A protein has these predicted regions:
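Extracellular parallel beta-helix/beta-solenoid repeat domains
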Residues: 1-148
Length: 148
């Protein structure tokens, strides 16, 4: 249900043409979440643009660090890192990956240098993409994510 994915204990939701950069979440402990643990995404909502249908060009989120962040909850709380999420009637659904219009690669929307430094999920240290997936992290392949 993509309608709920954007509600998370820690999240960054971006829609527009500005760059979101140099953000650090540090020394945070989440005891429980009824929704997701982490969520980052770019929301493409056409009415936010003057011409009605032009997404931003280039990197929109970069240099985001999650350092010493822990989820201790007993409930499963997935995490989502989406390059594009589109608003639809009744909620939000995952977009088409990095490119809004795959026939026009100039419309590139990306996340770069997303760092997980000592992030733990229910006791498991997230130090690789495989570990992240095992813990319910849904990360688009185009997202530039690093693990420490």
């Amino acid at each position: 249900d993509y309608g709920k994915n954007w509600r998370a204990a820690l999240s960054i939701h971006h829609s527009g043409n500005d760059l979101v950069e140099n953000i650090t979440y540090e020394d945070i402990r989440v005891e429980e979440s009824d929704e997701a643990f982490l969520c980052m995404g770019y929301f493409f909502v056409p009415q936010y643009y003057y011409d009605g249908d032009t997404p931003p060009l280039g990197v929109v989120m970069r240099n985001i660090t999650f350092k010493n962040v822990t989820y201790n909850g007993k409930k499963k709380a997935p995490s989502y890192l989406y390059n594009v999420m589109r608003q639809t009637i009744g909620g939000v659904r995952e977009g088409e990956g990095t490119y809004y219009d795959k026939s026009n690669p100039d419309y590139k929307i990306t996340m770069e240098n997303i760092v997980f430094d000592n992030v733990k999920y229910q006791g498991t240290k997230i130090d690789s993409l495989d570990k992240a997936k095992e813990c319910g992290f849904m990360i688009e392949p185009e997202v530039d994510v690093k693990f420490k």
